[in-house]
């Protein structure tokens, strides 16, 4: 493996998933021995004010602007073309030129749909092998450009969608979505139960409640769940300190049945002891669930990639989608009481996992880039 290649990984923090995938690929590059790897949050570096405003609007779309985001997501996918989206095609152009001049990359990897990168090739004539690592279980056309050399996708479904719009089969590889390696490592669960003071003889429900405040009335839900002596509830609030504080009294009263946590670095540990999880259908979280085999209850997916992700998992018997708050409690209690359905869902979601995605992707990218470089040299000499 030629680890002397210079790698530039571009991302954007519209949701944590794109950044997390970039970080995972960076760390895999380091493990493989690459000496020159750079990660750039291109839009943030290019125009911090615009980036922060649009990130704020993006996050708000999860709670108060769902219909606007639905119109944007599906509308752009239908009318997407270069003329109408000329401004987007140029976003980050100056900063990209600076990064290319500074780092002289042999490879560019996108974990966010940045069309400025393949457009850079068209405008300058400079051919830098460019690869898109897609972070959802669906396709949006904004990822697609004739100057992207290869796409790395989660499933055969996404590959089929790319082929339908004219992408050559050799330019698409099904690899899964890169996730942190600890999710694919074996680990005894006994110490984890002990660490969180949970019983292995009772069901564990994990509620990922910190993400953008999407799940409402968490306290009311927990008040009902703790009435069941056979269920232990773990609520991860992330950086949502207000939510954590609002649950503190209930936790104090039900310490053996309710655990309220803030940010959890080793969230994979909780996944290993969880019988089912309530979460939002982000591509990374769902991929992490496939690695360990955690059935998921997906609450009120936002129209767009979340809704498409949720549909994909529900259609394959790996998730239950709940669109009304009053249905959550019934869905959770019914699932936890039904061993056959739990077992089937665990198998179904585990079957969706593709292991070692980051390693597979980087090895293929290196092979593809070397082939492209050889072709370019042969073309010059001919």
Curated annotation (Swiss-Prot):
Pathway: Glycolipid metabolism; diglucosyl-diacylglycerol biosynthesis. The keyword Transferase applies. CDD domains: GT28_Beta-DGS-like. GO terms for molecular function: 1,2-diacylglycerol 3-glucosyltransferase activity. It comes from the Bacteria. GO terms for biological process: enterobacterial common antigen biosynthetic process; glycolipid biosynthetic process; lipoteichoic acid biosynthetic process. This is Processive diacylglycerol beta-glucosyltransferase. It comes from Bacillus subtilis (strain 168).
